[in-house]
Each structure stands twice: as structure tokens, then as C-alpha cells.
Amino acid sequence: FKVLKAAKAAGEWKIVNEWVDNLNPEILSTAPMTDEEGREGWCDQSLWYNYKARALIETDKSEKVLQFIDEVINKFPRQKKFFIRLKALSYYKLGNLNDAQDIYKTLCDVRRPDWWLLHEYARVLVDQGEKQDALKIMCQAAVSNKKLESMVTLFKEIGMLCKEIGQMKEARAHLLLSSLIRTEQGWSIPESISNTIMELNSVLNDDKTPSNIREALNLSRE
């Protein structure tokens, strides 16, 4: 699975799909792997289905995922949440927003929902026109994760949504936060972020522009 992991990280989903098709899942182990503390995780067969479903979704073949995902959900109860998420993502990619929303709502209706599930749920709500609810859930996602570098896209989307609903200061704070984190990590900054920040600076016409991540983070939480 090392090749699959590398291809996934590079976003080479066609390669992922080709590799999984060269493997017969029925001959793969169903014994869960364990970590150093003895906790059980994924097995080879469940990993195969995960890679296969993701590859189909990312290559615009989500309808094929829906043909087998329910069986997989029942087959691997330990990974149930992840496969149900893939079902929701398939519906979303196919434009079936109502079914996607229902599934994400159920997945997130727990004591401590994963931040990335909240993020995906919010995207569905945005497309449903429920922008205030989407913003609330995006902010819930942002405070649920301490790894800022993993949330640069989330911060960008919060910023763009804030701008869309007229919250200009909040929009700039989140876009600057995304930009500053990208700079610190040595990542490129999309023109859409830079251009929107300049536009907001012109609209706000003030001197409260944060110069570092801590300042931007504090402003985004106000």
C-alpha cells in the first residue's frame, strides 16, 4: 500500500485506481493491524475498499461507489464512520445534496465530531443556501483542531463565506490567517486569497491588519 499512499498524497487518483484494480480484495487480509499500544485499526481489505472508493469519487465515478458502499459499511464496523462519509461524499459529488446533508448531519451529531467532517458538512450547507448555518459549523470545525496548518483551506472558505454575507473584518482575518500559515509552511498563496485580501483592505481602510499568525488567529476568534 506504500505506492497507493504516495499516489493519494500526490492527488494522482487515476494511478490509485489502476493499482487497486490490479489487486483482488478477496485475497487480502481481514485481520486488523495493531499499533504499538495494541489498538486495532484497518485491515488490508478495508484499506483496499477505502482507496477504491476515494479513487472513484475523485475521478467522477461516484455512482459506482454507491453500488457497493453499503455492503462495505456492514462488513467493516470499525471503519463504519469513514465508509459512511464516503457515501455522503458520493452523494455530494453527484449533486444529491439532500441525502448528503442527512448523512453528514448524522455523522456530526455526536459529542466530538471530527473537524474535517464538520468542514465537509458545511460545504453541503453552503450549496444548499444555508450559509449562516454553514458558517457556524465551519467555525465549530476550526476550534475543534489545534493543527493550524491542516486548516488553511477551511480558513480560506470561512473568509470567503464571511465576505459573501457581509462580514468583512472577519473575512479578512481568516484569509490573512490562511495566507500567513501558508507563508510559514513555505506553501504558495492562491491569487484568489491575495486578491481578496487587497480588496478587503481597500473596503475596510483601516490599520488593523495582523502581521503574524497569532494576531490573525486572535482576530478570527473575536
Give the predicted meaning of each segment:
Residues 10, 59, 94, 128, ...:
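Structural motif corresponding to the intra-repeat A-B loop/turn of tetratricopeptide repeats
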Residues 1-2, 11, 40-50, 76-85, ...:
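Generic helix N-cap/helix-start motif at coil->alpha-helix transitions
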Residues 20-25, 139-144, 162-187:
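TPR/TPR-like (Sel1-like) alpha-helical repeat modules
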Residues 13, 62-63, 97, 131, ...:
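TPR-repeat structural position
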Residues 27-33, 77-81, 111-119, 145-154, ...:
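Boundary/linker segments of alpha-helical solenoid repeat arrays
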Residues 1, 9-17, 22-43, 71-80, ...:
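Flexible helix-coil transition and linker loops at the boundaries of alpha-helical arrays
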